[in-house]
């Protein structure tokens, strides 16, 4: 889990726009965040397996 201070810091509007970065809305992870969902890859995988993300299914070919 991310530290609460870092989550609050990321939520604040930065002085310069290039300093802004995405964090997972569910766990606060700063890396591998998909903008479309606002979630990190770990949370997307967990939620997709439980069927909580409509339209997302496991790839099979």
UniProtKB/Swiss-Prot annotation:
Q: What GO biological process terms are annotated to this protein in UniProt?
A: translation
Which PROSITE patterns does its entry note?
Answer: RIBOSOMAL_S14
- Positions binding Zn(2+) in this chain are 24, 27, 40, 43
Cofactor binding: number and manner: Binds 1 zinc ion per subunit.
Q: Which Gene3D superfamilies match?
A: 30s Ribosomal Protein S14, Chain N
An annotated GO cellular component: small ribosomal subunit
Needed co-factor(s): Zn(2+)
> One MF term in GO for this entry?
zinc ion binding
Coiled coil located at which positions? none
The alphabetical list of record keywords is:
Metal-binding, Ribonucleoprotein, Ribosomal protein, RNA-binding, rRNA-binding, Zinc
Q: Which domain of life is it from?
A: Bacteria
Q: Relate the protein's function as given in its record.
A: Binds 16S rRNA, required for the assembly of 30S particles and may also be responsible for determining the conformation of the 16S rRNA at the A site.
Classification via HAMAP family: Ribosomal_uS14_2_B (MF_01364_B)
Report quaternary structure and partners: Part of the 30S ribosomal subunit. Contacts proteins S3 and S10.
UniProt lists the family membership as follows: Belongs to the universal ribosomal protein uS14 family. Zinc-binding uS14 subfamily.
Q: What is this protein called?
A: Small ribosomal subunit protein uS14B
